[in-house]
Amino acid sequence: MCAVVAALWLLLAPPTPDLAAQVYRSNLFGRIGFSVWDLSWYGGHHLPGYSLWFPPLGALLGPRLVGALAAIASVILFERLITPYFSARATRIAAVWFAVIVVCDLLIGRLTYGLGVTVGLCSVLALSRNHPWVADVLGIACAT
């Protein structure tokens, strides 16, 4: 379900409330690289406040594609994380509800948040599979 909605979102490219900021930051990174402060957006703001990872990925792949891939990946990771602990039916229901939430964030353009959720889920999954060092690194990456 999430993959279908993400593909439609990419294809139709609807305007979303938060997408403009992510497109701006990605384009800015593409022009000047990492920057701490920018005066061109509503009188100035600090760029690292949203994400250190999203602008370079957005500049490389495009903000919409990064958001769509993060949405799909987070649903897959969530399902893998809960599968060992719940029945197949409960896992499926939880994954569908999680996908609905992820799709809502995608539709409004909260792309940096979606990428952070994906990295956070990677961290928790690594910890659940007894890879504490990987979980630590991903947890730190999630916080940036």
Residue spans for each PLM region:
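Start-transfer (signal-anchor) and selected internal transmembrane alpha helices
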Residues: 1-7
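Hydrophobic residues within the alpha-helical transmembrane core of Major Facilitator Superfamily
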Residues: 7-8, 57, 65, 96, ...
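Helix-to-loop transition at the C-terminal end of transmembrane segments
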Residues: 8-21
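Transmembrane helix interruption/hinge and helix-loop junction motifs
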Residues: 13, 60-64, 87, 109, ...
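Short hydrophobic/aromatic helix or loop-helix immediately within or flanking a transmembrane segment
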Residues: 31-65, 142
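Early transmembrane hairpin of solute transport permeases
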Residues: 39-41, 56-92, 97-98
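Membrane-embedded helix bundles of polyisoprenyl
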Residues: 72, 76, 80, 90-130, ...
